[in-house]
A protein has these predicted regions:
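C-terminal cap/substrate-recognition subdomain and adjoining C-terminal extension
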Residues: 63-151
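Short intrinsically disordered terminal tails
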Residues: 1-2, 151
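Alpha-helical substrate-recognition element adjacent to the catalytic core
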Residues: 2-90
Length: 151
Protein backbone atom coordinates (compact mmCIF):
# COMPACT_ATOMS: atom_id res chain seq x y z
CA UNK A 1 0.00 0.00 0.00
CA UNK A 2 1.26 3.46 -0.94
CA UNK A 3 0.54 6.82 0.64
CA UNK A 4 0.15 9.43 -2.11
CA UNK A 5 0.37 13.13 -1.30
CA UNK A 6 -1.26 15.39 -3.89
CA UNK A 7 0.43 18.69 -3.10
CA UNK A 8 -0.54 22.23 -4.07
CA UNK A 9 1.85 25.20 -4.01
CA UNK A 10 0.00 28.50 -3.46
CA UNK A 11 -1.06 29.03 0.16
CA UNK A 12 -0.35 25.37 0.90
CA UNK A 13 3.44 24.97 0.92
CA UNK A 14 4.23 28.52 -0.23
CA UNK A 15 2.34 31.29 1.57
CA UNK A 16 1.57 34.31 -0.57
CA UNK A 17 4.48 36.78 -0.54
CA UNK A 18 6.16 34.89 2.35
CA UNK A 19 9.31 36.59 3.59
CA UNK A 20 9.84 35.02 7.02
CA UNK A 21 13.33 34.55 8.44
CA UNK A 22 13.09 30.83 7.64
CA UNK A 23 12.00 31.39 4.01
CA UNK A 24 13.61 29.18 1.38
CA UNK A 25 13.45 31.32 -1.78
CA UNK A 26 12.69 29.60 -5.09
CA UNK A 27 13.95 31.28 -8.25
CA UNK A 28 10.98 31.60 -10.61
CA UNK A 29 12.71 33.51 -13.40
CA UNK A 30 10.50 36.58 -13.13
CA UNK A 31 7.17 34.83 -12.54
CA UNK A 32 6.66 36.27 -9.07
CA UNK A 33 7.91 35.74 -5.53
CA UNK A 34 7.89 32.16 -4.25
CA UNK A 35 9.25 31.11 -0.86
CA UNK A 36 8.58 28.07 1.32
CA UNK A 37 9.03 27.95 5.12
CA UNK A 38 12.00 25.80 6.12
CA UNK A 39 9.93 23.43 8.29
CA UNK A 40 7.77 22.57 5.25
CA UNK A 41 10.81 22.08 3.01
CA UNK A 42 12.41 19.70 5.52
CA UNK A 43 9.17 17.75 6.02
CA UNK A 44 8.44 17.42 2.28
CA UNK A 45 11.99 16.18 1.62
CA UNK A 46 11.64 13.52 4.34
CA UNK A 47 8.19 12.48 3.13
CA UNK A 48 9.44 12.02 -0.43
CA UNK A 49 12.31 9.77 0.68
CA UNK A 50 10.23 7.33 2.71
CA UNK A 51 9.39 3.95 1.26
CA UNK A 52 5.83 3.57 -0.07
CA UNK A 53 5.22 7.33 -0.04
CA UNK A 54 4.87 9.42 -3.17
CA UNK A 55 4.41 13.13 -3.90
CA UNK A 56 2.37 14.26 -6.88
CA UNK A 57 1.95 17.92 -7.72
CA UNK A 58 -1.64 19.14 -7.65
CA UNK A 59 -1.20 22.58 -9.18
CA UNK A 60 -1.28 24.27 -12.54
CA UNK A 61 2.07 25.96 -11.81
CA UNK A 62 4.19 23.39 -13.66
CA UNK A 63 7.14 25.74 -14.19
CA UNK A 64 7.37 26.34 -10.46
CA UNK A 65 7.18 22.62 -9.64
CA UNK A 66 10.21 22.04 -11.84
CA UNK A 67 12.11 24.84 -10.10
CA UNK A 68 11.16 23.55 -6.64
CA UNK A 69 12.32 20.02 -7.52
CA UNK A 70 15.65 21.27 -8.88
CA UNK A 71 16.44 23.86 -6.23
CA UNK A 72 15.53 22.03 -3.01
CA UNK A 73 16.20 19.26 -4.40
CA UNK A 74 13.04 17.22 -4.08
CA UNK A 75 11.74 14.06 -5.73
CA UNK A 76 8.15 14.22 -6.96
CA UNK A 77 6.70 11.28 -8.84
CA UNK A 78 4.30 13.13 -11.10
CA UNK A 79 1.79 15.91 -11.73
CA UNK A 80 -1.97 15.66 -11.92
CA UNK A 81 -3.40 16.64 -15.28
CA UNK A 82 -6.46 18.88 -15.06
CA UNK A 83 -8.25 17.87 -18.24
CA UNK A 84 -11.62 16.46 -19.29
CA UNK A 85 -13.73 17.08 -16.18
CA UNK A 86 -17.38 16.08 -16.22
CA UNK A 87 -19.64 19.01 -17.03
CA UNK A 88 -20.13 21.28 -14.03
CA UNK A 89 -17.23 19.80 -12.03
CA UNK A 90 -14.15 21.78 -11.00
CA UNK A 91 -11.33 20.38 -13.14
CA UNK A 92 -8.94 20.05 -10.21
CA UNK A 93 -11.54 18.09 -8.22
CA UNK A 94 -12.12 15.77 -11.17
CA UNK A 95 -8.38 15.03 -11.41
CA UNK A 96 -8.10 14.39 -7.66
CA UNK A 97 -11.07 12.01 -7.65
CA UNK A 98 -9.79 10.23 -10.76
CA UNK A 99 -6.40 9.72 -9.07
CA UNK A 100 -8.07 8.26 -5.95
CA UNK A 101 -10.19 5.95 -8.15
CA UNK A 102 -7.04 4.72 -9.90
CA UNK A 103 -5.44 3.88 -6.52
CA UNK A 104 -8.31 2.25 -4.57
CA UNK A 105 -6.10 0.24 -2.18
CA UNK A 106 -3.84 3.17 -1.37
CA UNK A 107 -4.16 6.24 0.84
CA UNK A 108 -4.55 9.43 -1.19
CA UNK A 109 -4.09 12.74 0.63
CA UNK A 110 -4.79 16.04 -1.05
CA UNK A 111 -3.15 19.03 0.68
CA UNK A 112 -4.60 22.14 -0.92
CA UNK A 113 -5.96 25.42 0.40
CA UNK A 114 -8.89 25.05 -2.02
CA UNK A 115 -10.02 21.62 -0.75
CA UNK A 116 -13.03 23.26 0.84
CA UNK A 117 -14.35 23.84 -2.70
CA UNK A 118 -14.71 20.10 -3.27
CA UNK A 119 -18.15 18.47 -3.10
CA UNK A 120 -17.79 16.14 -0.13
CA UNK A 121 -20.56 13.83 -1.35
CA UNK A 122 -18.28 12.74 -4.21
CA UNK A 123 -15.26 11.73 -2.12
CA UNK A 124 -13.95 8.19 -2.00
CA UNK A 125 -13.07 6.42 1.25
CA UNK A 126 -9.35 6.38 0.45
CA UNK A 127 -9.22 10.16 -0.18
CA UNK A 128 -8.33 12.52 2.67
CA UNK A 129 -8.41 16.31 2.36
CA UNK A 130 -6.02 18.52 4.30
CA UNK A 131 -6.81 22.23 4.28
CA UNK A 132 -3.86 24.28 5.62
CA UNK A 133 -4.49 25.69 9.09
CA UNK A 134 -1.23 27.57 9.60
CA UNK A 135 -1.26 31.23 10.64
CA UNK A 136 0.89 32.08 7.59
CA UNK A 137 -1.57 30.62 5.05
CA UNK A 138 0.34 27.36 4.68
CA UNK A 139 0.40 23.86 6.11
CA UNK A 140 1.06 23.99 9.85
CA UNK A 141 3.28 21.55 11.73
CA UNK A 142 0.07 19.99 13.04
CA UNK A 143 -1.22 19.54 9.47
CA UNK A 144 2.03 17.78 8.56
CA UNK A 145 1.70 15.50 11.60
CA UNK A 146 -1.87 14.67 10.52
CA UNK A 147 -0.58 13.67 7.07
CA UNK A 148 2.13 11.52 8.67
CA UNK A 149 -0.46 9.73 10.82
CA UNK A 150 -2.91 8.90 8.03
CA UNK A 151 -2.77 5.26 6.98
Amino acid sequence: MTKYLLLDIDDTIAPSMYRGSDAIEIETWGRGHLAIPKYIVEWVKLFSKKENQSIWWCTDRSNETTQIEKQLPLKADGKLMFTKPPKGVWKKQAAIIRFAEEHPKDTVICADNDCDLMNSDKLLGNLHLIIPTGDIKALSKEDLATIDNLK
